[in-house]
């Protein structure tokens, strides 16, 4: 299969765009997208946020405004680049509402340093992608695979919507975790994902191993785990890495915490080192 025929790369399209390009959202995702804009010579014309978060603060030199203020200046014929991720229903509804009224894309950027999923990436990995596609056993899985490729290339939300599955369907019919799971949570926050897993296993598990580097989040995780779960539970105040070492960590509290060039020196751990030969059957990373 020629995967390059599925869709045009969002980056190529944005390079050719003559209409104003505005970012919806701030934070790590927007940082990464604007870095690619700089590298590729794509010009952003503004940044807006949901009305309740638009306070006129500066982000990369742009005043963060409401959409209504943005369109009052630039007009309605704009390209909106969604620059953050969410699974909250009300936020997704807002994204879909924007998609219905504007030209909207959500570029896929790597969470950690690495290549973009663009034409060059597809050309380099097309043989691997073909082998993965052929391993899939049913038509629905193959279509989800193709829609994922289409989305990662184009940034079009419709491809994600085509492949959505409700949380109950995912846990009860696809992942189907059971009482014998050895669960490793890399970036455990306050234990929210562990709680979710235990909801679907009726509180049963073989072991839980959780890493969380942020000191405030780890305290909440420890308090919750001590009060609510018993058994083979290992909580480690450390970030997940490919080796055991000390890294600077910007602990801005909660989900915005990240490895940085400056910040608090923080222990990082490789999961293999933490497990020390113990099994892992269910792995969550973020």
Predicted features, each with a name:
Residues 1-24, 28-44, 50-285:
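Phosphate/nucleotide-binding beta-alpha loop and adjacent structural elements of enzyme active sites
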């Amino acid at each position: 299969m020629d995967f390059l025929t599925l869709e045009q790369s969002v980056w190529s399209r944005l390079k050719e765009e003559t209409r104003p390009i505005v970012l919806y959202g701030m934070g790590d995702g927007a940082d990464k997208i604007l870095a690619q804009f700089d590298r590729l010579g794509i010009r952003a014309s503004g940044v807006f946020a949901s009305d309740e978060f638009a306070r006129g603060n500066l982000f990369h030199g742009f005043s963060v405004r409401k959409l209504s203020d943005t369109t009052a200046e630039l007009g309605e014929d704009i390209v909106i680049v969604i620059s953050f991720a969410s699974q909250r229903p009300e936020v997704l509804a807002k994204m879909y509402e924007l998609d219905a009224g504007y030209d909207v894309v959500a570029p896929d950027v790597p969470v950690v340093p690495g290549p973009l999923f663009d034409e060059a990436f597809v050309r380099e990995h097309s043989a691997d992608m073909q082998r993965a596609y052929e391993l899939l056993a049913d038509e629905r899985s193959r279509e989800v695979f193709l829609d994922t490729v289409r989305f990662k290339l184009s940034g079009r939300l419709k491809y994600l919507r085509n492949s959505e599955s409700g949380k109950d369907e995912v846990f009860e019919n696809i992942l189907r975790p059971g009482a014998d799971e050895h669960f490793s949570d890399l970036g455990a926050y306050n234990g929210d994902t562990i709680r979710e897993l235990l909801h679907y296993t009726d509180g049963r598990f073989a072991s839980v191993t959780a890493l969380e580097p942020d000191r405030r989040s780890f305290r909440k995780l420890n308090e919750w785990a001590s009060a609510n779960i018993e058994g083979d539970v290992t909580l480690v105040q450390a970030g997940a890495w490919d080796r055991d070492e000390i890294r600077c960590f910007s602990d801005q509290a909660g989900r915005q915490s990240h490895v940085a060039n400056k910040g608090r020196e923080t222990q990082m751990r490789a999961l293999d080192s933490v497990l020390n030969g113990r099994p892992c059957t269910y792995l969550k990373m973020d």
